[in-house]
From Swiss-Prot:
Subcellular compartments: Cytoplasm
Disulfides per UniProt: none
UniProt entry keywords in alphabetical sequence: Cell cycle, Cell division, Chromosome partition, Cytoplasm, DNA integration, DNA recombination, DNA-binding
An annotated GO BP: cell division
Pfam families, alphabetized: Phage_int_SAM_1, Phage_integrase
Active-site residues, as the UniProt record annotates them: R159, K182, H250, R253, H276, Y285
Organism domain of life: Bacteria
Record domain Tyr recombinase: where: 116-298
Subunit-level organization: Forms a cyclic heterotetrameric complex composed of two molecules of XerC and two molecules of XerD.
One cellular component (GO) term of this entry: cytoplasm
Main location: cytoplasm
Stored PROSITE patterns: CB, TYR_RECOMBINASE
Full protein name: Tyrosine recombinase XerC
Organism: Rickettsia akari (strain Hartford)
Length: 305
């Protein structure tokens, strides 16, 4: 149970993350869970209901004790780092909106995360997936939705959250998609005809009317399709066809990058297409013109025709 004032601040913080920072729903939910875990620990630590004063006066011993508790509870290094990042984000929000001054929490460094290489699928596994994803849908429009979404992710290297935010307005430009990604960073992705044609076919039989600004990928009841729903479709596909365990919507984004690289595409062009600040932690990406990005597709992409 939370103090009413704190709950109001959390609600405002979540709206800020979505509306001003353009965070995905998944990130906001994860951050919210991490913050509540921190506040529950603070409640236990102080043996009383947490108030805004407890938050303002939290000392380094409390924060380090919370991190140690998460480590004891077998949270991964990545989860511990994300949790600290979430709490720091909330404190930064309090700095902007209340009288909270610079806090000791900002002096605490995140634990170093073990870097795992992204797992891509083989081109054969991608082909099997694209050929058979339509088998999981029960009705024609859902089958076509699944295929057009999967092709879009693999053809464009989009994050699942970005792909699920595509609207009719994105379809009006015949040459490229303008994507607002993490941290409100904009990037340009050339349209591949195969992706756009499938989406057009899907929209022609979609049983729901949509405004120009509404996401086009819908669930069976007409609401915006959620990532976990689509990944459940991929789990069925994976099990039936014996595809790799790491097959998820995100693995097609990794495959997009890996297959371009294997076919000779320039690293910095891939970097730009993915919307990364860098493909390594030390390398900043350079801007590439739309024509240059289109040239990458024309010469290197395996499903360009």
């Amino acid at each position: 149970m939370l103090d009413i004032l704190i709950q109001e601040l959390i609600d405002k913080w979540q709206k800020y993350l979505v509306l001003q920072r353009n965070y995905s729903n998944y990130t906001v939910i994860s951050y919210n869970n991490d913050l509540k875990n921190f506040l529950e620990f603070m409640n236990y630590y102080n043996s009383e209901l947490v108030t805004i004063n407890h938050i303002k006066n939290a000392d380094i011993r409390l924060i380090r004790s919370w991190l140690a508790k998460r480590n004891y509870d077998n949270f991964t290094t990545s989860s511990i780092a994300r949790g600290l990042s979430a709490v720091k984000n909330f404190y930064r929000f309090l700095e902007k909106t209340t009288q909270l001054n610079s806090h000791i929490i900002f002096s605490i460094k995140s634990p170093k995360k073990t870097k795992l290489l992204p797992k891509a699928l083989s081109e054969d596994d991608v082909v099997v997936s694209l050929e058979h994803i339509e088998e999981y849908g029960n009705v024609k429009w859902v089958e076509l939705r699944n295929k057009s979404l999967l092709v879009l992710i693999y053809a464009s290297g989009l994050r699942i959250s970005e792909a699920l935010s595509i609207t009719k307005l994105h379809l009006q430009n015949l040459e490229f998609i303008r994507i607002i990604g993490k941290g409100s960073k904009e990037r340009i992705i050339p349209w591949l005809p195969i992706a756009k044609n499938l989406i057009t076919q899907y929209l022609e039989i979609l049983p729901y009317k949509l405004g120009d600004n509404e996401p086009i990928f819908r669930g069976k009841r007409g609401k915006k399709l959620q990532p976990q729903v689509f990944n459940r479709e991929l789990i069925k596909l994976k099990h039936f066809y014996g595809l790799p365990q790491h097959l998820t919507a995100h693995s097609f984004r990794h495959s997009f990058a890996s297959h371009l690289l294997e076919r000779g595409a320039e690293l910095r062009s891939i970097q730009e297409l993915l919307g990364h600040k860098s493909l390594s932690t030390t390398q900043n990406y350079t801007k590439t013109s739309i024509k240059r990005l289109e040239a990458v597709y024309t010469t290197a992409y395996p499903i360009k025709k």
